[in-house]
Structures are given as structure tokens and as C-alpha cells.
Amino acid sequence: MSVPNSSNKQTCFTARHIGPNSEDVATMLAVIGVESLDDLAAKAVPSDILDNVTDTGVAPGLDRLPPPATESETLAELGALARANTVAVSMIGQGYYDTLTPAVLSRNILENPAWYTPYTPYQPEISQGRLEALLNFQTLVSDLTGLEIANASMLDEGTAAAEAMTLMYRAARSTASRVVVDVDVFAQTVAVFATRAKPLGIDIVVADLREGLPDGEFFGVITQLPGASGRITDWTALIAQAHSRGALVAVGADLLALTLITPPGEIGADVAFGTTQRFGVPMGFGGPHAGYLALHTKHARQLPGRLVGVSVDSDGTPAYRLALQTREQHIRRDKATSNICTAQVLLAVMAAMYASYHGAEGLTGIARRVHAQARALAAGLSAAGVEVVHQAFFDTVLARVPGRTVQIQGAAKERGINVWLVDGDHVSVACDEATTDEHITAVLAAFAATPARASFAGPDIATRTSAFLTHPTFTKYRTETSMMRYLRALADKDIALDRSMIPLGSCTMKLNAAAEMESITWQEFTRQHPFAPVSDTPGLRRLISDLESWLVQITGYDAVSLQPNAGSQGEYAGLLAIHDYHVSRGEPHRNVCLIPSSAHGTNAASAALVGMRVVVVGCHDNGDVDLDDLRIKLSEHANRLSVLMITYPSTHGVYEHDIAEICAAVHDAGGQVYVDGANLNALVGLARPGKFGGDVSHLNLHKTFCIPHGGGGPGVGPVAVRSHLVSFLPGHPFAPELPQGQPVSSAPYGSASLLPITWAYIRMMGADGLRTASLTAIASANYIARRLDKYFPVLYTGENGMVAHECILDLRPITKSVGVTVDDVAKRLADYGFHAPTMSFPVPGTLMVEPTESESLAEIDAFCEAMIAIRGEIARVGAGEWSVEDNPLRGAPHTAECLLASDWDHPYTREEAAYPLGKAFRPKVWPPVRRIDGVYGDRNLVCSCLPVEAFV
């Protein structure tokens, strides 16, 4: 196995994607002490699971992948798939609407690696730009919903609704386990939270709440505003009645409609949920879009997902950070408020900037135009004798046409328009920002009607009186020049892959190649409604089929669902399949989930959501699962065992040699094996979890398969299963071609518009390229481990002294002897121009480093030199040259402002602070703020835009 030389880089994408060339790899292998990449694989990967290259020159499982294509060939093939789709005018609605994305946002956010390549802002000092953008998003949602606090995005409307339901379940005064849902909530939303409710023992009662609340106790009420039928209902009295009975109320609200109608917070709602899709984010055959969740401050600690708050840095300057992180799954595990990790940051930024670009009056103007088009449609229908069912509506007109629905749907289709067939008697038509007078005329013609001269007689829906989006952020950036410069100014505050490697362990921050990204803006993909007729999307469906087939071959499983729109949802879907499998066999009592103590907290949080009881399995000092303890737990829980969740390679960054034995022991005890695919970047082409004992895995396309992290989303988390679990994969009420399992996302294929990225990556890499990528990632990690071990001991290695694709550096002895902490080192790396590795996971007081295959040897060496220099600084602290309280590590990061201050009373020089390895080392990164005070931010919770005076 070899890395392609630079001589064929014009045609070989693999050499573009993989950072080290063949000479660099030889250098790394010499340091590691192995002769070749294949020799490295033989020493690192257990022989009983390793897929060696066969006589055909290809590893098993990859032999049916197409040969690698060039970038131009791949784009041509994607173009052909795109052209096979029909871009109809979508007037389907049901939560998905066409929108006009300002080009300044597409070019400067969606197509800008400064925005789409960063990771979740766990290092806030070098993430101030996107944290500010997310605070803008939270302010947007809070203002429009009339509620005090909103989180930094959800995965989609359906999962936001499910989280709203479970939040009310935790927070309500009522001890009941029933939730009442209005009949006019979107069907796909009801399906998603029905999935969530069942394993938690929550009963869902669907009722027409216009007729009042049902008898009996319930903890929550869920309504939609406007409803799926388009109806606008004043829920004020109903909400008061629900409160009087000890229940909380959540409203699924259309944010564009809320510029006109009274917001949920002002009619008494406790929670609002929904999507920001129509704020400049294309439909994309279902996603990705930023969902939202807003509530009253008193419930802030119940809020799932990320929450951006305002704090201060060490100089007292206002600064942004993630707030209340103790709610989250990586800390609270099975007691967390949610299993959500990745959300939809990139799309939240798009929505926030769309609102900034248009402002309150612009958004209101768009809403008025949309409503005017809907009224014109209703007027024409009424004039032609067609019954318009609801008089009060925003954008969707429901027409009663007994016996004519299919005819009308077909007539609209002939005119290039898709409408929504509700049932045998009703058709609904939704207007949006892209709707024109010509579209209205064409739809009316499908009903055998014409535009009416008289206006529609329905009521005025513009009942909102409160102001919104009054902060200067939503008034200053109305010209393209000002918006372009604002976005650039924010991006310059952050470290993304366009500036530096991001060596975050367990995150796989690899290249997101431009050729992979190019097609996600093509309208043949972006303007597809997820419920569009099958005949409109043959190209997308072929792409999905290809990708499912390729992932099956790569993983060794029998089927894949692409519906989960994050790794957390893939985990949930996989565990749900196991849960339903046991139930189908008459063993519903099997509810014990074994999880190693080293596992990521999302595993435990996902298991809890499926109603499983988490039992922790111990690990040895070397990080491996304690087989003796596993056998004890298997024996203790044999009759109730459901599943073992295990990450492979392990969360400790090594290939456990007993993995096949572990899987066999679980199967012998009647359980299933869930192999967490978070670390699949060390397996592709080397070992297949579906062949070495896994029954289920979720994959992270935003890690292993090049979908960008977007600063904290989007992601795609497909779930792969063996044949006995196929029928339990996620289904969907509007996609009968899918299995009949329970949906976990609003759209049948989740965030489908991202799938061309992974399709392109696999198509361009081919079998040999994919295997070489895995081997290079392993080589890079082992090279770092060898170079840094004498400075920062590598905590875990496998049987032959090898790590997998990441290594853990142990700083605990340093902290104990010198007092310098892992936080000090992480913050100091910013002064050297690097993003820190993963801090204190899976072991407190450590750094986990994952270089990926995309980083060059020069970049890896620069990182190592920075770490070695930091070790030298630590030595000076240990020698007493600098005190523990005042040294360049404890003072890090250093801003330009602090270095230019007239007073400098530190024992180290300004030059040592700013340029520790000299000005020629690498381009300087200037953190915009000093170290941020996290405790202050949580004690003084502020989660919306600060007044300008705060920064003066």
C-alpha cells in the first residue's frame, strides 16, 4: 500500500486529499519503526479482524466499489444525476418552503471554508465569530417567539418537537404520562415524537383541540401555529386551561408567520419549536435545516443541545461561550437532558444572517407578500365556487374539492407545480417567498379557476404588536458590502481548517474538498421538497441507492438507512432497532445496555432515550474492556441483556485485540452488539464491524466521509444493520418505499442535500484510496505519539505499542508536579496558531490528538514543535523561573490589545507571549479575547445579543 506520488496529482484525487506524500510517509514510518503502511496495519489491527488485500489488489468489502474517478469525471456524473431530477415549483408546504437565498450569504457562508470547516466552539477564545453568529440566531428565535431563551439550533422540526415533549415531561407539575397533540400538527412531526414517546412510556392523545382539552390528566399539550392545514387558531384560552390542569404547552411555530401573528410567548406558551428553513436555507430534499427550541428562562437547565451565553474574559471584556454545559450528554451521560451533540450550526448562521440582512421590516415585508399571494389564491378559488376551508391562514390554503383531488394535483403537475393532496376531498396549496403571480394563475387554472378581481374576505391576521429584531445586529448590515465585511470580520475571529489543522481527537477534522462541496448548491438538489413525487427525483434516489450500497460494502453490514441527521440520531435509531427486535421476539424485558466506562456520554444518553437501563462495564488501566467484568455483567443480566455498546477502535484510541471475543460473548448471552462508528476513519478498508461481530453501527458522514462539521453541524449519522434488523430501520409516513420502522427525522432521507459530498468522496477515492486514507491517518497519529511521548507520555497503546488514528497525551503528572493544567496548554496553543486537541476526554487532564490523513507532514511537525516548545515553557515554570500564577501558559491566550497595553508587569516578555517560536514559525493567529470566565457566564446567564454599550 502506497500513497500516490505528486506526479499524477492532476488526475488522482487521493493525492489531493491525503496530506503526506510517499516521501513523507516513509519519514513517518521510519520514526514509528515499521517498514510500510501494510506493516503498520499488521502491527496495529488485530489479525482476526484485519482485512488484508487479496490477489485482486483490493481489500474485501471494497471490491465492488467503482474505480476512482477524477474530480472532473465525478462532477460530470453528479451533473447527470442532478439533471435527471425535475425542479418543479413546490407549493406542497407541510413545513418545507422554497426560499430566496441571498447570494452574499451563499458565497460568504455556505461556500466559505472559514464557516463550514470549524468544529463545535469548545475553545471559545478562538471561536468568537461563530459564537456571535449563534447568539444572533438565539436572539432571532427568542424575539420572534416571544420567549426569553432559545438554544443554538436543533436538528430539524421533528426532533425539536420530540425534545419539547420530553422537556415538558421533565418540567411539568403533572405526574401524568400523557401528552395531548392537536390534530393539525404536521404528520411527520407527530410521527417523530411518537417514536420518541413509545420507549419512554409516554402516551400520545391526538385530538381536535378547537373542541377543548380531553378529560383526564396529561403533562403537556402540543399545537401548531399555523396548523398543517394552514389554519391560524388563537390558542390563548386553551393554554390557560392547560396550565390550570398542571400541564405545559408547546407550540410549533412558523417564524416567518410570527412577524405578523401574535407569538407563542405572548399567548402563554411555555415552549416554542420549529424550523428556520425558510430563512434562506433551501429545502434540499429534506435538509439540513436548523430547528429551534425556545422557552422561559426558568426552564433553561432543561434545554437540550448547545446554548451560547455571554461572559467576560480575564480583562473584563464581554465574550461568548457555550453555557450550562453540565446539562449535556458528554458530562451527564444517561442523566443528560438529551443525546444531541452535533446540531445545525452552519444553517443557524445562515438563518441568522438572513434575518440580519433583511431586518424586521424586510422579514415582515416578505411575510406580507407571502400572505397576499395566499389570499389571492383563496379569492380566485372562492370566486370559482371552490370551498376554502379556513378563513384565517398565513401561507397555506386548504381547498375542499370532493372527488377531484387527484385530477387537480395532476393538472397542477402539468403546469410544473406540485401541490399537496391531503385526502380524497382536500388539496392544500402553500405559498412562499418564491411564489409569483404566474404561479398563482397556474394553480388556479388547475382548479379550473382564474384570478379574482375582488379580494379575499378573510380576517386580518396581523395581530402582532410587539417589536422584534431591534438590536443593531439586525439593522446595520443591509448592504452587501456591510454584510460581506461583517461575515469576514466574524470569520477572522475563529480558527477553522482554512487556517490550521484542528487535531481534535474523536472528531476527525479532515479535508472537505471543494469538488465534494460543489454540487450542494445545485438547484436540482437544493430545490427538491422531501415529499415531492418520486418521478421528480430519480437522480437523487439513484445517488442515495449508490451511497447505501457503498456504505454496506465498506462496513460489512446488510443495509443502511440515511435518515438520521446526526450521529446522535443514528445511535438512537440503531438502539431503537435493537429494542424493537427484542420486542418482536417476545422479549420486551431485555432492556439492559452494557457500556464501557470509557464510552462517550452520547452512548449512555441514547440508551436512556430508548428506555434502556445503563450498566457500566469496567476497563483496565490500559483502557481495554475488562473481560472478566464483562463476563460478570453478562451473567448478572443474562435474562435482561439487550445490547453492548462499544466504540471501535476504542475511545482510548487503540485497537482492542479482544473485540471479536467480546462480540461473541455478548451474542452467546442473547444480546446484540452496537459498534459505535465514531472512529470508523481507522477502519475503512482495514476491518468491517459487520463482519467482526457488530449487529448495528452508526456512521458519521461528517467525520469519516467528508461532510463538513460546520462549526457544530450539519451532520449525517446513517445507521447500518445486519439482515435480522433491516425491517426495524427508520420508516416515514410519506415514504412507503422505506422499512416500516419508526422515523427519527422529519424527512425520509434526513439531510439529503449533503449526501452528494460523501458520494463524491467515495467515488473519487475508490477502494485503494479509502484504505490508504485510513492507513495514513493511523501513521500520522503514531508519528505524533512517537515524537511527543517523551514530552507528554502517551497514555494508551495497543499490544504492539501502536495507537489507532488518535493518541492521548497525559498531562496529569505535569499538573500534579508543576501546576500547569490541560486548560493552560490548550489556551497557549492558540498563541502558537493552533486549535487545541480534545481536552479531558475520555480521561480528565489529558489531550486527545487526531491529525487525520489530510494534514501534511509539515503541519504535523509544526504542531509537534509547538507542543515541545510548550513543554519547555512548563519546565521553566517547574524550575521557578515563572510562577504558576503568572506565566505565558496561565496568561494565554494573548490578544493584540493586551500586548499593546502601556503596562506589562509579567515576568515573560511580550515577544514570548505573542511569538513563542518567532515570527517566521507560522502565520499569526490573534485571539480576539483573553481566557473566558466560564463560572461567571453560568451565574449571570445572558443568551441574547448584548447592547452595544457593553463593548465600549
UniProtKB/Swiss-Prot annotation:
Source organism: Mycobacterium leprae (strain TN)
HAMAP family xrefs: GcvP
EC number(s) from the headed UniProt entry: 1.4.4.2
Sorted UniProt keywords: Oxidoreductase, Pyridoxal phosphate
The keyword Secreted belongs to this UniProt entry's keyword annotation: no
Molecular function terms, GO-annotated: glycine binding; glycine dehydrogenase (decarboxylating) activity; pyridoxal phosphate binding
Cofactor(s) needed: pyridoxal 5'-phosphate
Biological process, per Gene Ontology: glycine decarboxylation via glycine cleavage system
Family, per entry: Belongs to the GcvP family.
Keyword Oxidoreductase: yes
Gene encoding the protein: gcvP
Role: The glycine cleavage system catalyzes the degradation of glycine. The P protein binds the alpha-amino group of glycine through its pyridoxal phosphate cofactor; CO(2) is released and the remaining methylamine moiety is then transferred to the lipoamide cofactor of the H protein.
Coiled coil: none
This protein's name: Glycine dehydrogenase (decarboxylating)
Reactions mediated catalytically: N(6)-[(R)-lipoyl]-L-lysyl-[glycine-cleavage complex H protein] + glycine + H(+) = N(6)-[(R)-S(8)-aminomethyldihydrolipoyl]-L-lysyl-[glycine-cleavage complex H protein] + CO2
Transmembrane segments: none
